[in-house]
Amino acid sequence: MFMAYATSLRSADLSRQIGVVITKNNEIISEGTNDCPKSFGGLYWPEICRDGSIQDIPSGRDYTLGYDSNKRSQLEIIHAILDNLKIEDSPDNIKAIKKAGIGNLTEYGRVVHAEMEALMMCARNNISCKDGIMYATTFPCHNCAKHIIASGVKEVIYIEPYPKSKALEFYINEITQDETEKDKKVLFRPFMGVGPH
C-alpha cells in the first residue's frame, strides 16, 4: 500500500491524487496514478530540458492548461439546461443543478484514472493482471470498477472511501465486500494495517 501511496504523489490532477499498484504472486506488476495520457502510451511527466531545468510539456497536464476540463464541461451542461428551460442563470440555480448529480460526473476529464492506467500498463507490456490484487489509495469509481471486473483482477484493497462511486450499486453480481463470497465475486475491501502517511 505504501507503493500505491508513493505513486499518488506523482499526480498533478486538479481534483484528487490517487495511486494504484497491481500485484501478482506478491510482486508489483504495474502502477498507476491519475494524470493526463500521452500519445503512444503512458502519462505526461516533467522532462529535463537541455539547460538542465525540469519542465512540464505545455498543455500536457491539466494544471498547465489552468482549468479542469471536467469542471468546465459540467458548467457548460448546467448553463445549457438553464438556457433550454429558460431559467435564470443564478448561483442558487447552478448550485441546485450540481446537487442533482451533474457535479458528480467524471467522464469529461482528460485525466486517466489511476486504476485505468495500472490496467493499461499491464496491457502495454503484455502482462496479465488476471487473479492480481489491486492496491488503491481510494475506493474505485464505477467507471474504473467495470474495467477492474473485466480485467480479471480478483481483489481490490483501498484506503479512502469514495462516496460518489456507484460501483457497489451497479455491480451487485460482480463485486462483494463479504470475504465469504470472494470465490464468486471481485472482493473490494478496506486496507487494514499501518497506513502509509
Predicted segments with their positions:
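Zinc-dependent deaminase catalytic domain
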Residues: 1-197
